[in-house]
Design a protein with these regions (language model features):
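Short catalytic/metal-binding and nucleic-acid-binding patches
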Residues: 1-234
Length: 234
C-alpha cells in the first residue's frame, strides 16, 4: 500500500506569478533604503497572490476566516487562486466568500464589534480608512497606507482579533487565512467603485436591503453628503 502524500503546508511555487513579480519590479515603484528599513517591499508574492506594499497608496483589501475555504473543497478554491486574469480571480473569490462557507464567526455581533473596533483604533494615526465592511466570513477594506506597511497593519489586525475571538468563542487554533488580497487604487473613479463595492457587499450577499442597514460597515456612518466623520472635520 502506498503511503499517503504529505499535506502541503505552503502553496507550491507559481513560476508564472514569480515572473510577473519580477517584471513589475523592473518598471514599477521601488522602495528606497529608508522604506526598506520600514519593511515596505514594493511588489512581492506570498504563495498564490501578488502584493504591492508602498507608502502613500490606497488599497482595496480582502482577508477571510481560516475555514472560509474548506479543505473538502480545496480543489475548487485552488483553481480560483491559480486563475491568471487578476480581475476574473477577484470576482470568483468574492463570489465564493459571499456564499458563506465555514462557521462564519464574524456573524456573531460581539465578534463583529470587536473586529470593527480593532480596525478603527488607529484610524487617522497609522492609516486612514476610506471604507470597510465586516461580512460573516471575510472583511473588505479601502485603506490609505501611510507610514506603516500594509502587511504589518493586516498582521496587527488579524493578531489582535484572533486572540480576542478565540477567547470569546472558546476555541483554539487559526482564526484567519494566512494571506490576503490587495488591489492598488488607481484613480478617483476606481476609489469610488471600491468604496461602493465594499459598502454594498451585504446587499449583494442578500444580508441587508440597504447598505446602511448592515451594522458593521462604514456605510452606516456616512451623512447625507456621503461623508464619514473624519471627512466632516476636514
Amino acid at each position: 500500500m502506498e503511503s499517503p502524500k504529505p499535506i502541503r503546508r505552503t502553496p507550491p511555487k507559481n513560476l508564472g506569478l514569480l515572473e510577473l513579480i519580477r517584471a513589475k519590479r523592473e518598471w514599477d515603484w521601488k522602495p528606497s533604503v529608508a522604506e526598506l528599513k520600514k519593511s515596505f517591499r514594493g511588489w512581492h508574492q506570498r504563495g498564490y497572490l501578488p502584493h504591492f506594499d508602498a507608502p502613500g497608496v490606497t488599497q482595496f483589501v480582502t482577508f477571510q476566516l481560516h475555514d472560509s475555504f474548506p479543505v473538502t473543497r480545496r480543489a475548487e478554491f485552488e483553481a480560483i487562486l491559480k486563475e491568471p486574469d487578476d480581475s476574473v480571480k477577484r470576482r470568483k473569490l468574492e463570489a465564493w466568500l459571499d456564499r458563506g462557507h465555514g462557521e462564519c464567526w464574524l456573524l456573531h455581533p460581539d465578534m463583529a464589534e470587536i473586529m470593527e473596533k480593532i480596525l478603527l483604533e488607529a484610524d487617522g494615526h497609522d492609516y486612514r480608512m476610506q471604507a470597510w465592511v465586516i461580512m460573516p466570513n471575510h472583511v473588505h477594506l479601502v485603506v490609505d497606507v501611510w507610514d506603516v506597511p500594509l502587511v504589518k497593519l493586516i498582521n496587527s489586525w488579524k493578531g489582535k482579533s484572533s486572540q480576542l475571538a478565540n477567547a470569546l468563542l472558546h476555541r483554539n487554533g487559526k482564526f484567519w487565512q494566512e494571506d490576503y488580497y490587495d488591489t492598488v487604487i488607481r484613480d478617483e473613479a476606481h476609489l469610488k467603485r471600491a468604496i461602493r463595492y465594499t459598502e454594498q457587499n451585504p446587499v449583494k450577499a442578500c444580508l441587508a436591503k440597504a447598505a446602511r442597514e448592515w451594522p458593521w460597515s462604514s456605510a452606516r456612518h456616512r451623512d447625507e453628503y456621503e461623508r464619514l466623520p473624519w471627512q466632516r472635520r476636514e
